[in-house]
A protein has these predicted regions:
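Conserved class I S-adenosyl-L-methionine
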Residues: 1-39
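Conserved SAM-binding loop of SAM-dependent methyltransferases across substrates and taxa
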Residues: 54-65
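Conserved SAM/SAH-binding beta-strand->alpha-helix loop
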Residues: 76
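Conserved SAM-binding loop
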Residues: 83
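Conserved SAM-binding strand-loop segment of SAM-dependent methyltransferases
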Residues: 88-99
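A short SAM/SAH-binding and catalytic strip from SAM-dependent methyltransferases
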Residues: 110-122
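Conserved beta-strand signature within the Rossmann-like core of class I S-adenosyl-L-methionine
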Residues: 135-146
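Acceptor-substrate binding/catalytic loop of class I
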Residues: 155-171
Length: 200
């Protein structure tokens, strides 16, 4: 199991991610459109991007929300070094999401996590962890759900690495939000979850 978790510590996969993202900057994919729309609806000054990968959300913030202070963290040094070099920005740090604390989160208005909880074998645990941090807002991307028990499958990302694709039990997601005193503020995808802005 740990082999797949560590598979993202791979320079080549983040180079492919960056190449894909740079092409997408000419015509935004839907989840980027959602991100820009969500951020336009709220007043925030400090954003923490968990699982930042090659760091393209920094560029989205710079272009659309230049007053927002962006910080990106990723457990993969390969991702962080690439992001720092390409975007010429020092606000990327090597950090596992499990190292985050409530005290650290107090410095941010909003937590952004896209393609993190869904590439873990324990996505429910990760979602619970984010909620327990109690940020004021959270943007949760690619929050895939199922009516059955939470589960995952294995797939190949960027034709490079084997990784997980996690599906959360929808009732458990709703329960976790309720227990954490969060409400779904925006869900433009019109799905039970998928891409959400939640707030306290």
């Amino acid at each position: 199991m740990s082999t797949y978790i560590d598979s993202w510590k791979n320079k080549k996969v983040f180079e492919k991610q960056l190449e894909t993202n740079l092409n997408e900057l000419n015509s935004y994919p839907q989840h980027w459109e959602y991100f820009v729309s969500f951020m336009s609806k709220i007043n925030v000054q400090h954003l923490l991007d968990i699982g930042c990968g090659c760091g393209t959300y920094y560029e989205l913030c710079r272009k659309h929300f230049p007053d927002v202070k962006y910080v990106g963290v990723d457990y993969a040094n390969e991702a962080v070094e690439l992001a720092k070099k390409h975007w010429n920005y020092s606000g990327f740090y090597v950090k596992n999401y499990k190292e985050l604390t409530k005290e650290y989160i107090k410095h941010f208005d909003i937590l952004h996590a896209c393609s993190l909880h869904n590439v873990l074998p324990n996505g429910d645990e990760a979602l619970q962890f984010f909620i327990d941090l109690q940020p004021r807002y959270m943007i949760l991307g690619k929050l895939l759900t199922t009516k059955g028990a939470s589960t995952y499958k294995v797939y190949k990302a960027y034709n490079e690495i084997e990784t997980y694709l996690y599906y959360h039990n929808i009732d458990n997601v709703k329960k976790l939000f309720k227990q954490g005193n969060y409400e779904v503020f925006c869900n433009p995808s019109q799905l039970p979850t998928e891409y959400l802005l939640v707030r306290k």
